[in-house]
Amino acid sequence: QDPIYTMVDVACNSDLVLMQKHMPEPLTDYLKRYDDHPQLNSTMATKYPGLLKLDVNHFNKPPRVRVSLMPQKYSNILEPKMQDIASRILDVNRLKKLGWEVHLNYSPLVFYPGWKEEYNDLFSEVNAYAGINKCEVIALTNHRNQMAKASPKAQELMRRSYELKNKSGVMRYPLIHKTR
């Protein structure tokens, strides 16, 4: 949520940072459309912040990038071959220096035995290396198509998280610690 602009997810559930070399136009031109708009601004999520080299300090308003985070051992299962979590955290301050508005995207939040302790460790690591950041937390939702493509370990994690939902679909595990 943004107090001034309507945020448009320009990546449409894909990773534009990863796909930027395949785009028909430079990422700068694509984002500039929203920079010049009086009511809209752009946002996109990535699991590859290390590939984002674009300096946007010359923009009128900073585009938002949401850096996806979760404990590394579950990242290895749920998002194999992605940029490792520690280096994503280290990229946060570099992106800020390039003019990006950085949000941390704790997504998907997966519930498993010991999840609170592991997320507390992750929050401590973020605070130590990336400082204070805005964030969003998105609980894992059950997408049959995604589960069918996932490894057996990932399917088990997703199934366990899905079973913790009540009938309204609301998770009953509030986060006590936040990254400020």
Question: Model segments located where?
Answer:
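Core AdoMet radical
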Residues: 1-91, 101-105, 136-140
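Generic detection of long, well-ordered alpha-helical segments
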Residues: 20-24, 116, 180
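Amphipathic alpha-helical segments that form well-ordered structural scaffolds
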Residues: 29-33, 94, 125, 180
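Generic, ordered loop/turn and secondary-structure boundary motif
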Residues: 52, 110-112, 159, 163
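A short, terminal or domain-edge coil/loop segment
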Residues: 60-68, 94-105, 121-128, 155-167
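Conserved C-terminal portion of the radical SAM core fold
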Residues: 87-148
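Auxiliary Fe-S-binding modules of radical SAM enzymes
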Residues: 124-180
